[in-house]
Amino acid sequence: MTSISIDQPIHVIGGGLAGSEAAWQIAQAGIRVVLHEMRPIRMTEAHRSDSLAELVCSNSFRSDDAANNAVGLLHAEMRRLNSLVMRAADANQVPAGGALAVDRDGFAAAVTRALAEHPLIEIRRGEVDGLPPADWSNVVISTGPLTSAPLAAAIQALTGEDSLSFFDAIAPIVHRDSIDMTKAWFQSRYDKVGPGGTGADYLNCPMTREQYDGFVAALVAGDKVDFKDWEKDTPYFDGCLPIEVMAERGPETLRYGPMKPVGLTNPHNPTVKPYGIVQLRQDNKLGTLYNMVGFQTKLKHGEQARIFRTIPGLENADFARLGGLHRNTFLNSPKLLDSQLRLRAEPRLRFAGQMTGCEGYVESAGIGLIAGLCAAADAVGRALTPPPPTTALGALLGHITGGHIETIDAGPRSFQPMNINFGLFPPLTEPPTHGADGKKLRGPEKSVAKKQALSARALADLDRWIADAVRVAAAA
């Protein structure tokens, strides 16, 4: 790697998914990087190691279907931009039906190793407990949902904005050999085959109507973690609701959510349709650990063990990790950040990852990727044109930095975190109306064709952007 002669390195604060990706992109552009990570000097309430890019919640990067799914499209775009996160994910994938899931320890180790071995990256362990020094002229702040209190307070004082917060919950992990396979079975929903998968990638635990009703009642009645006074009004992110909160919304809610009994047949009793099904997904490459899909929870640990062992097949479950809560903090990005993710009040500071209001592993890494490219371009005195809004990266960036609706029905509307989805993309100029066979598209076929057209447009536009903007900026 050829180093570009610049007096000051770029500082990246936070070694999660976004910070790791940002540091990688900057270094790959030939610019020195100092990556600051406070762990293990100071740990968070959710992390368990000092690894960079540690996955705290699920081990799933969600769908890898670039033609039909927005997050799969985001995967494809990041791969085209030589994403370290996607490279490590692909190298450490585990079977997960149509999803891309990873061995979390192998993934974090791969990212950590790549960054530690890069000649232009210096990793500094220690907390940055306030605004970066004035002589740090180019900074990416990617400290994530668990930003330390001193740094969060300094950012709040600088911006004059109250931080917005919500809670994410973490799902339990079970040792595979403690699951009773006379009751559970392997099958992906609708036998779908995904990257590294076979169509039989999930463990399924069936419930009768009586078992389901008793389970829901136990979730609602179980003892939960108490909130501190300052936490009581903090909402949950809808994409990561605790299982018991979903249960409180109605007795049938879980049957239309993570416990839906569709696309699966119990080989132990094939003529009887389960009333509800609990799925577990492989969590490590060895296949020794499985996480409970959609079972993030704020139940107390004793209650988790008691209630989850009433699930058929999990009566003797040995839990490698029980569920828990962690708090997320993010900026009012449309108001505070420009299109380059720079803080309007102090442009030397750029933000990336979940702090900006994107939600999800891949989304955080994607925004880290863009922040890294922008910071590298700034370092050589050349602004990088943002990716087109027709791409997944551009659509997500647009939501964060300006696509948010400030008012609705003459009232204020708060900025909330967002996963990538096709609703963020500009509509097609000419939506598909007929299939390859010439027949008029209707219903689900029309929806599928629209998604495929959006994806095809995105990848074509991304390729042009890489050629016209990224390579030009890199050559400056």
Swiss-Prot record:
Region (Disordered): 428-447
Record keywords: Cytoplasm, FAD, Flavoprotein, Methyltransferase, NAD, NADP, Transferase, tRNA processing
Amino acid composition bias (Basic and acidic residues), ranges on this chain: 436-447
EC numbers, comma separated: 2.1.1.74
Subcellular compartments: Cytoplasm
Needed cofactors: FAD
Gene Ontology molecular-function annotations: flavin adenine dinucleotide binding; tRNA (uracil(54)-C5)-methyltransferase activity, 5,10-methylenetetrahydrofolate-dependent
CC annotations in GO: cytosol
Pfam families documented for this protein: GIDA
Catalytic activity entry: uridine(54) in tRNA + (6R)-5,10-methylene-5,6,7,8-tetrahydrofolate + NADH + H(+) = 5-methyluridine(54) in tRNA + (6S)-5,6,7,8-tetrahydrofolate + NAD(+); uridine(54) in tRNA + (6R)-5,10-methylene-5,6,7,8-tetrahydrofolate + NADPH + H(+) = 5-methyluridine(54) in tRNA + (6S)-5,6,7,8-tetrahydrofolate + NADP(+)
Known role: Catalyzes the folate-dependent formation of 5-methyl-uridine at position 54 (M-5-U54) in all tRNAs.
The protein's name: Methylenetetrahydrofolate--tRNA-(uracil-5-)-methyltransferase TrmFO
Organism of origin: Rhodopseudomonas palustris (strain BisA53)
Protein encoded by which gene: trmFO
